[in-house]
Amino acid sequence: MAEALPEAGRYFCHSCTAEITPRLPEYTCPRCDSGFIEELPETSRNSESNSSNNSGTDQNRPSFENIESAQFTLPSGYGQVTFGIFNEGLDFPMFGTSGPVEETRDGESRREHQSRQRYGARQPRARMSTRRGAGRNEGVPTLEGIIQQLVNGIIAPTAMSNLGVGPWGVLHSNPMDYAWGANGLDTIITQLLNQFENTGPPPADTDKIQALPTIQITEEHVGFGLECPVCKEDYTVGESVRQLPCNHLFHNDCIIPWLEQHDTCPVCRKSLSGQNTATNPPGLTDMTFSSSSTSSSSSTSPTDENNTANNS
């Protein structure tokens, strides 16, 4: 004779946090297919019969019945925050003062509250349920995103120094390693710039600096509107300037400090070694200067003087 099927009875599903009629003979939840169910005592069935009749069938219950919440206690002075995640949507964080969270929320049924109180069940971990309404959850912010906004919005860097990674699973390192606000970003940029401060070309050789020719500015130089590329001051007739191998002219006090730190021309970035010297730089390509037979200091053009210095 075949054995009679066991009676289904009433069970409590810890995954759905709701009273259900299990699927036999597997004893699984018909809503979430979970086997984490517990049989209700006979006394609890009678006490909750009225609430079961009023609430209707499981299929007609609103989605707010299956709310799951998680409570985080923030550092002193910040109170508490509760996250509520529904099966078909997301309840954004609500901030309040320190103290117990309201036990009866709009989205939690009376029976669910009594069941949790009876079994001493802990508040389940906040998670995104995908068994129903998966399409509606597309584009909904994740819990990690909400926590990141919470950290960026209300937790000060001084308060985060003692938290470490702790419950803030989205922070994968020390919170003080992050840039907090505009000032923190400015600090990082300043540090990066300081790292590149001394990474330029090496200083020019002292002998090459002393060997740079000194010429005097003539009226032809002034007529072309030449100026010192460093201080941007116009040259005056009879003024002594230093000429680099690339034919660029500079005030002595402007170019010497630069060459003592960098072996390059401030204008064309050519070295003083002569290997990459620009014989006709763009600024002097179309300039021609006539020789003066009466003045020994301005008897040749800047180009001729540079060639003479190289030949010697």
Curated annotation (Swiss-Prot):
Per UniProt, the ranges with Basic and acidic residues bias are 102-115
User: Its annotated pathway?
Assistant: Protein modification; protein ubiquitination
* Lineage top rank: taxon: Eukaryota
The protein's Enzyme Commission number: 2.3.2.27
Q: Which UniProt keywords apply?
A: Cytoplasm, Metal-binding, Nucleus, Transferase, Ubl conjugation pathway, Zinc, Zinc-finger
Q: Where does Zn(2+) bind?
A: 13, 16, 29, 32
Q: Where is the composition biased (Low complexity)?
A: 44-55, 290-301
The molecule here is called: E3 ubiquitin-protein ligase RNF126-B
This protein's species is Xenopus laevis (African clawed frog)
